[in-house]
Amino acid sequence: MTRAKSGKISKNRHKKILKLAKGYRGRANSCFRVAIEKVEKALQYAYRDRRNRKRDFRGLWIQRINAAVREHGLVYSQFMGALKKTEIAIDRKVLAELAVNNSDGFVSIVEKAKAHI
């Protein structure tokens, strides 16, 4: 009986890792031992940064809203407090989009919020 060495299975496993490592520098894209370490680390970074992306975008939206609101003589925290009082339920993502692309709509929201300060 012939000896089974899982040749096809390990070859496919190696191929899968090396495919994921395509584009890496040095031996990381051709040497399995190096590639597997780099791919594992890349997947860890990807997992971590999918969560960080949410934080980063929230910060970006807040910066954009703050910059747009300051042009109208308010501060971000005052504006958001006034929005809550007026019961206007628009999230930060949409507010930032309005501030950048639809300034007329944003100005009308700011005016309504100013009335409740």
Swiss-Prot record:
It comes from the Bacteria. InterPro entries: Ribosomal_bL20 (IPR005813), RIBOSOMAL_L20_CS (IPR049946), Ribosomal_protein_bL20_C (IPR035566). GO terms for biological process: ribosomal large subunit assembly; translation. Keywords: Ribonucleoprotein, Ribosomal protein, RNA-binding, rRNA-binding. One of its GO terms (molecular function) is rRNA binding. CDD domains: Ribosomal_L20. Coiled coil: none annotated. This is Large ribosomal subunit protein bL20. Transmembrane segments: none annotated. One of its GO terms (cellular component) is ribosome. Belongs to the bacterial ribosomal protein bL20 family. Binds directly to 23S ribosomal RNA and is necessary for the in vitro assembly process of the 50S ribosomal subunit. It is not involved in the protein synthesizing functions of that subunit.
